[in-house]
């Protein structure tokens, strides 16, 4: 949904080059104002769903073995911050289409939006590090039934590492480390998509397993209750017969 709004509708992939002048940037946002507005609206709705996704991951993490509580709530907190970073950037781009502005103001707004979108790597890095560490704690000592497979922990660690190049985009106006470059845009974007899809699939599988386990536990609990009730009934009948004999 986010890619539909950001890429297909708004046309922000590939991103506007950092070397564009204020006049060129103003012309771009004026010519495509309607599609950018609509694309940003769709992207805003999609960005909000990241909060629910982070909450779902947190619930799953709280079921893991080991002391993962702090890691789970860290994931929830930085997931919420991640949503804000997306939303603020999208609102800035929307406001650039709202009225005619000085070219230098447009440049400053666009720079700020892209730095928010690309350069703040600390939150996704901390989120993936927290998830990966929790997975390793859950799978240590050869636990037979981990929530997520151990390789998912390595995936999260690698994702954290591959997000790192975006941090230095502020030093470059062109090349692979600019905000539209290979290492700061296309690589993290691809990695982010793979990570989201992989973790979502793992959550769906885990959800089914946890639900089946909960149903089995519930069935076992119901059976135990029935056995206790049956024993109580047998004891009551035995006591009644004993009194009748007396």
Could you describe each region identified by the protein language model?
Residues 1-238, 243-246:
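Hydrophobic, aromatic-enriched alpha-helical segments typical of multi-pass transmembrane helices
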């Amino acid at each position: 949904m986010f890619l539909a709004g950001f890429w297909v509708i708004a046309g922000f992939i590939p991103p506007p080059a950092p070397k564009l002048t204020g006049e060129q940037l103003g012309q771009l946002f004026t010519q495509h104002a309607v599609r950018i507005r609509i694309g940003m609206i769709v992207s805003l709705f999609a960005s909000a769903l990241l909060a629910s996704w982070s909450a779902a991951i947190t619930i799953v993490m709280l079921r893991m073995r080991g002391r993962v509580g702090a890691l789970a709530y860290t994931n929830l907190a930085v997931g919420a911050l991640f949503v804000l970073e997306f939303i603020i950037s999208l609102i800035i781009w929307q406001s650039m289409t709202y009225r005619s502005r000085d070219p230098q103001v447009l440049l400053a707004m666009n720079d700020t939006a892209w730095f928010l979108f690309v350069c703040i790597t600390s939150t996704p890095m901390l989120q993936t590090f927290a998830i990966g560490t929790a997975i390793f704690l859950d799978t240590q000592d050869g636990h037979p039934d981990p929530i997520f497979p151990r390789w998912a922990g390595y995936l999260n660690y690698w994702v954290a590492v591959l997000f790192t190049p975006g941090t230095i985009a502020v030093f470059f106006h062109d090349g692979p480390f600019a905000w539209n470059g290979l290492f700061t845009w296309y690589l993290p974007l691809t990695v982010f998509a793979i990570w989201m899809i992989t973790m979502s699939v793992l959550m769906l599988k885990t959800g089914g397993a946890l639900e089946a386990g909960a149903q089995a536990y519930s069935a076992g609990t119901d059976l135990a209750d029935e056995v206790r009730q049956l024993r109580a009934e047998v004891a009551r009948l035995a006591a009644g017969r004993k009194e009748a004999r007396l």
